[in-house]
Amino acid sequence: MEIGLTHYLTVGAILFGLGAFGILMNRRNVIVLLMAIELMLLAVNINLVAFSVFLNDLTGQVFTLFILTVAAAEAAIGLAILVVYFRNRGTIAVEDINMMKG
């Protein structure tokens, strides 16, 4: 049995669905929201690499490297902001962060 394009696309769709489900179902913890967004980006990367290999084109793999770089920077900056916010406020609940809109 050979693993084809549909298998990779199915895994990508499942991961994307889990990430979307995590965003929709969890409205309290910011760290879980960040992890769900990262899971969705991982699903997009899997799809890009799968199409890149299927079409014998390196463009998808190059985009994946850029997305991974941006996602790593996003996660680092997001977690740093959360650490500073937690030190100042003592909580990272989404409801308390929404109070900042003022």
Curated annotation (Swiss-Prot):
Localization per record: Cell inner membrane
Membrane-protein topology: Multi-pass membrane protein
EC number: 7.1.1.-
One GO-annotated biological process of the protein: ATP synthesis coupled electron transport
Keywords from the named record: Cell inner membrane, Cell membrane, Membrane, NAD, Quinone, Translocase, Transmembrane, Transmembrane helix, Transport, Ubiquinone
Keyword Phosphoprotein set for record: no
Single GO cellular component term: NADH dehydrogenase complex
Family from the record: Belongs to the complex I subunit 4L family.
The protein, known as: NADH-quinone oxidoreductase subunit K
Source organism (scientific name): Rhodospirillum centenum (strain ATCC 51521 / SW)
Primary gene name: nuoK
